[in-house]
């Protein structure tokens, strides 16, 4: 991912497993490069924070890592991004569940999983298309790097 971005890119995370993975795996190289709510559990933080970052620094790439649970907390802000012509990229990790909640249930509640999986899969590509966002679906792609690079470097 980092190889596809400018070194000045601002990385924003929502709350969930994707937040942990981003914090652990992304090669951050300077202060202020990561915007996250930390351990405060504020699902829905990512998309509005990415909008703010992109408005404050329109010359920098802004990428929001989110999960299917977190993005649904403020999904309407996709409309704001399109209406205000804000250049953000959303990397959505969709596992059809509240992944971090599910993981905690598996680890600490003897595999008793309750209300952390969604009954019906959500089609986020169609939703984003409906808001007028450009979309790329990496599901099932054996080598996602070329598509990811194109998506991240596309202007809006």
Place the predicted regions along the sequence by residue:
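Conserved thiamine diphosphate
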Residues: 56-147
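Active-site diphosphate/adenylate-binding microenvironment
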Residues: 1-53
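Structural motif
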Residues: 9-11, 32-35, 60-63, 87-91, ...
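Fold-independent oxyanion-binding glycine-rich loops
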Residues: 1, 14-16, 37-39, 67-69, ...
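Short, structured coil segments at secondary-structure junctions
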Residues: 29-30, 84, 131
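Phosphate/pyrophosphate-binding active-site segments
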Residues: 1-15, 135, 139-145, 149-150, ...
């Amino acid at each position: 991912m980092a190889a596809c971005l400018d070194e000045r890119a601002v990385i924003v995370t929502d709350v969930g497993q994707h937040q942990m993975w981003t914090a652990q795996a992304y090669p951050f190289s300077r202060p202020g490069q990561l915007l996250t709510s930390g351990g405060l559990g504020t699902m829905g933080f990512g998309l509005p924070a990415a909008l703010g970052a992109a408005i404050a620094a329109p010359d920098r790439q802004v990428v929001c890592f989110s999960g299917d649970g977190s993005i649904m907390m403020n999904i309407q802000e996709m409309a704001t991004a399109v209406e205000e012509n804000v250049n953000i990229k959303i990397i959505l990790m969709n596992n059809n569940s509240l992944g971090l909640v599910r993981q905690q249930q598996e680890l600490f509640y003897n595999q008793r999983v309750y209300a952390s999986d969604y009954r019906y899969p959500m089609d986020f590509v169609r939703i984003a298309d409906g808001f007028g966002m450009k979309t790329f679906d990496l599901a099932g792609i054996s080598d996602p790097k070329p598509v990811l690079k194109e998506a991240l470097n596309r202007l809006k």
